């Protein structure tokens, strides 16, 4: 089992640029973490909505995308290919993320990233779909399998400005619909 951090601010990740992303720098801001894939059926929608949320809250929200290839092999690019895939293939049309992307990682199983070990420990299932499971067990390519596992691409975790995991959302919950919860956490008029 992966080490589970004591605090959200003890965590870090490595960006696509190879630089360390220290979560301690996120104090006082809400953070939206989403496992992403560039070849999923909802890639265009979700990536565009992530950009939109980051643009709506440029100083008070941090959006982090964690590319993952564990669901249908839908992020099969190498780290150095991901941005070009997004720009020219899907979403395409010159798309550029306005948020940070990390290097590819596992979100489930023995090699799960410590960020996801922590978040799944604190938020073991999506609030909008507490019975959410992988729809096709033949697609499970990791071990061990746990009830709290992320079930597909574009599952989301919202963390409050004090570092407390607030809510987990299923893959079917549209990213843009998280905005009222972001406003609530930031105490912005809805």
Curated annotation (Swiss-Prot):
Function: Catalyzes the reduction of hydroperoxides in a glutathione-dependent manner thus regulating cellular redox homeostasis. Can reduce small soluble hydroperoxides such as H2O2, cumene hydroperoxide and tert-butyl hydroperoxide, as well as several fatty acid-derived hydroperoxides. Cannot reduce phosphatidycholine hydroperoxide.
Subunit and partners: Homotetramer.
Reaction(s) catalysed by this chain's protein: 2 glutathione + H2O2 = glutathione disulfide + 2 H2O; a hydroperoxy polyunsaturated fatty acid + 2 glutathione = a hydroxy polyunsaturated fatty acid + glutathione disulfide + H2O; tert-butyl hydroperoxide + 2 glutathione = tert-butanol + glutathione disulfide + H2O; cumene hydroperoxide + 2 glutathione = 2-phenylpropan-2-ol + glutathione disulfide + H2O
Disulfide cross-links: none
Protein family (similarity comment): Belongs to the glutathione peroxidase family.
InterPro entries noted in UniProt: Glutathione_peroxidase, GPX_AS, GPX_CS, Thioredoxin-like_sf
Name of the featured protein: Glutathione peroxidase 2
Any one GO molecular-function label of the UniProt entry: phospholipid-hydroperoxide glutathione peroxidase activity
Location of the active site: 40
Tree of life domain: Eukaryota
Subcellular location: Cytoplasm, Cytosol
Keywords: Cytoplasm, Oxidoreductase, Peroxidase, Selenocysteine
EC number: 1.11.1.9, 1.11.1.12
Gene3D superfamilies, A to Z: Glutaredoxin
Gene name of the encoded protein: Gpx2
GO biological process: biological process involved in interaction with symbiont; negative regulation of inflammatory response to antigenic stimulus; response to oxidative stress; response to symbiotic bacterium; temperature homeostasis
Main location: cytoplasm
Pfam families: GSHPx
Cellular component GO terms, alphabetical: cytosol
């Amino acid at each position: 089992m992966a080490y589970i951090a004591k605090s959200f601010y003890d965590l870090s990740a490595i960006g696509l640029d190879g630089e360390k992303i220290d979560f301690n720098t996120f104090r006082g801001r809400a953070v939206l973490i989403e496992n992403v894939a560039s070849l999923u059926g909802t890639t265009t929608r979700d990536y565009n909505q992530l950009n939109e949320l980051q643009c709506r809250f440029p100083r008070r929200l941090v959006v982090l995308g964690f590319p993952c290839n564990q669901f249908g092999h839908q992020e099969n690019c190498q780290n150095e290919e991901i941005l070009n895939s997004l720009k020219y293939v899907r979403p395409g049309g010159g798309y550029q993320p306005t948020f940070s992307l990390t290097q590819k990682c596992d979100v489930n199983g023995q090699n799960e990233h410590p960020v996801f070990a922590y978040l799944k420990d604190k938020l073991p299932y999506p609030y909008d779909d507490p019975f959410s499971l992988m729809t096709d067990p033949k697609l499970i390519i990791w071990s061990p399998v746990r009830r709290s596992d992320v079930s597909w691409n574009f599952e989301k975790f919202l963390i409050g400005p004090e570092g407390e995991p607030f809510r987990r959302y299923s893959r079917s919950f549209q990213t843009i619909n998280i905005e009222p919860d972001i406003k609530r956490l930031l105490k912005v008029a809805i």
